[in-house]
């Protein structure tokens, strides 16, 4: 049996993280707690907070307040879940970076630009996989292999399905 939880940017859980320390913040929806923390240059920092707007969740450590080069979001849950998708919204920023489920191999983040003007890039990472209770999903704006362009984006949404034992 499975139940579904869906978050759509500031209308959902993202607004609950607004202004909270990126050292770690927790919100609850439909019986599942989600914990998000941010890192800058692979370090936890108390100087940044989460920000949200109509495009999604970002970090305040840079001027643009997105997830910029060298920044990452770490997401975990208090239950076993299937992460069906994560929406990445770059807007005027740049898609790029990687995601990683637990200790599995990292995979590149790619986006599309509907009208090729580089002003509305977005991507949907789908079929991400099972995330066991306490495991982390890392969404990182750093280049995947160190040679690609870094990302500058927001987490626009997350769709999960709870696994019932």
Give each language-model segment a name.
Residues 1-70, 132:
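N-terminal targeting leaders for non-cytosolic proteins
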Residues 69-79:
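A short glycine/threonine-centered beta-strand motif
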Residues 78-86, 134:
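Extended extracellular/luminal ectodomain segments enriched in beta-structured repeat modules
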Residues 92-107:
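Short, surface-exposed beta-strand/strand-loop-strand elements in extracellular ectodomains
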